[in-house]
Amino acid sequence: MKLFAFLTTLVLFVCVAQAQRVYPSHWYTGMKDRRLQLLIHDSTEIGKNVQFRSSSKDVRVVKVNTVSNPRYLFVDLELAATARPQELVFTYGAAGKAQRKLTYQLKARHSGNGRERVKGVHAEDFVYLMLPDRFANGDPTNDIIPGYRSNTADRANRYDRHGGDFKGIQNNFDYLQNLGITTIWMTPVIENDVTMMHEFGNNVAGYHGYWFTDHYQIDKRFGGNDGYREFCDAAHRRGLKVIQDAVYNHVSKEHWFVLDPPTDDWINNWPSFQGPSHREEVLFDPYASAYDRKVMLDGWFVDHLPDLNQRNPFLATYLIQHAIWTTENFGIDGWRVDTYKYCDEAFLNKVNEALYREFPAITILGEAWVNSVVGNAYFTRNNMQTPFRYNADGVIDFQTCFAMLAGMNKADGWMDGVNKIYSTLAQDVVYKDPMHNCIFLDNHDMDRVFSVAGEDPERLKMALNWLLTLRGIPQLYYGTEVLMKNFKNPNDAMVRMDFPGGWAGDSVNKFSRAGRSSLEDSIYTYISKLAQFRKKSPALTRGKMMQFIPRNNFYVYFRYTPEQTVMVMANTGNKPGEMRWKEWAERTKGFTKARDVIS
């Protein structure tokens, strides 16, 4: 009888271990904040009045939290200041019931944080944005992963996965560095184990990465957790930095904690589908209604992406610890935070503060597609008097993007053409430091800039000049350098095509000079020359700026330090511009000659 009882208990331990989820999946000693909250999810009920015991004196059990879903447990722990790396053993279960066993790893923090990795991204960097699924396929064996909900890789279908991965990007580090790139930003790499979703009239795969199903798994079609760590390490060895794309606002409806939520308020639920207003003004409008704020912050982005309630303390801690774990585990240098303006304000500051505490050099950029410079500045450190103040380093600077596109394409007007650039930059007074903003000409949600330029290479060059000489951190969208084009017609997939040459058997290989047309290669070379100059230019990477009021389509500004002055001139008209040297004398006085940095 005793033997039978022992075997029954042993079987229980094995079954529970197989069905048990524990997050964070491991943790680190040496954190400034020694608190840790474990989320435990079992396939069977854990029960009430749960006891939780640690095998190590290095870990103190502070509190055991049960929630409405009996399959969950949230355990507050505190690590000793002297805690060492080790394997912990926890036992837990309801009093008088069979106890469950959990082994857990404490690891040492990386000694290279802030020097070799987690270095931050700054104005001297040049960011390259790509969708990893669409850049290059370096390992065709991971295109199909048995057990995933959707298992196709069909390049003929622009809405399906195509097979790009980390290895494909690694294989082209030389290409990127020859272009002058210092930093790689990929759209999200976290697992999107989803069925094809019906979106905007099409069945779409999660190829873009924004539909998370398990935060602690990197998508195996990209290379998985081990492949991502290898990718980040290889990038750092080459002197490249990595930005990861975070999404705190929502997850896929097929995320495991949406299918079995811990609490009733884990998701921002509505009686029927309610999308956000997309009007960020309600967050700083002194006259805004509480209803409009709620719709903006709690509305679902689309109907298959449940909106996360970051006011739930357990969910907030889960997301914060995941951000810390990811940074330490993979050594990323910065975060670009998607859908920033739709997230709970206090939560965003809390997660940013936690990251800055553990990784003082890290960079955080909020992505908020906004309607004004004031809206832009609201989501970063600013000089405005508002009831709430954000703490992110900078923002993805849509207003400067729109201004550069207007300067590239539109005739000079009081507030249009190059005057839009002038007036937009004149409003930098609202930012604490606009040098931390990420500036760009297009991205994965916009028409490609070469198409917007009317496929005019001279217009494109003019816009590239601004991109690489204005204040801020410049970002290039993959393929711009080889004149990839398209409008978002009928949808975003049209501006997310495969990079030519990234797949075996491609008819052309634009990673190679021989595969590029003379025009394409001239643009690649143009960007490379300007980017390489910029990288070594104190004026462009840390200098002040002085701009002059545009006249007759002629816009002039200077970037300067005590040791260097760079003059940038743009004529957007169809006639020669007037060289008004007397007006520019306060920046040109004392100089007798200059050189063209491109020729």
How should these model regions be labeled?
Residues 1-24:
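Bacterial Sec-dependent N-terminal signal peptides
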Residues 19-47, 108-111:
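Beta-strand/beta-sandwich contexts
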Residues 28, 106-129, 134, 138:
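Low-complexity, Pro/Ser/Thr- and charge-rich linker/hinge segments at domain boundaries
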Residues 32-87, 92-95:
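Immunoglobulin-like IPT/TIG beta-sandwich domains and homologous Ig-like subdomains
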Residues 77, 564-571:
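Short, well-ordered beta-strand segments enriched in hydrophobic/aromatic residues
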Residues 98-107:
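Edge beta-strands of extracellular beta-sandwich domains
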Residues 135-329, 348-358, 368, 374-376, ...:
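Substrate-binding/active-site clefts of carbohydrate-active enzymes
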Residues 250, 322-324, 328, 333, ...:
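Active-site-proximal helices and loops of the catalytic beta/alpha 8
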